[in-house]
Amino acid sequence: MKKVLLVDDEPSIVTLLAFNLEKDGYEVTTATDGAEGYRLAISNPFDFIILDLMLPSMDGMDICKRLRQEKFDTPIMILTAKDDELEKIIGLELGADDYMTKPFSPREVLARMKAILRRTNKAVPAEPVATAQPEPTEDETEK
């Protein structure tokens, strides 16, 4: 089972993402402030990190930068309300593997995470995130 560290200080986002990740078979560890997230990241083997930027005690950019300076190669996705182009560029240059902005779709987070994991040494099999079929049109339901 793949292990994901989710670092975000918004309880509703933590609940939503943890639910969807666990439903998809991931083991999720959560942290609600930057210092706790950093401590967990360096002391536990995670396959993936989802990281907010605006966190109490240590911001996400600092966490990402420090992890990369210390040669941690765990894939990192920044998930934040900061949608400024410069913030995105800085986050990616500091070592994030992806940068998504809030609001977000949990299905898209999962799809992006799986794509990154497939291309790293943390490989997972390619499985569709959504298997839902389109709703039948009125013409199809009358047949």
Model-derived regions: residue spans:
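Short, Lys/Arg-enriched segments at the junction into DNA-binding effector domains
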Residues: K3, L117-K143
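Active-site beta3 strand of CheY-like receiver
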Residues: N44-I50, L55
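Acidic catalytic/metal-coordinating carboxylates
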Residues: D33-E36, D59-D62
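Charged docking surfaces used in two-component/phosphorelay signaling
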Residues: T15-K23
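Short hydrophobic/Thr-rich beta-strand motif most characteristic of the beta2 strand and flanking loop
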Residues: G25-D33, L40
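The feature encodes the CheY-like receiver
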Residues: V14, P56, E70, D84, ...
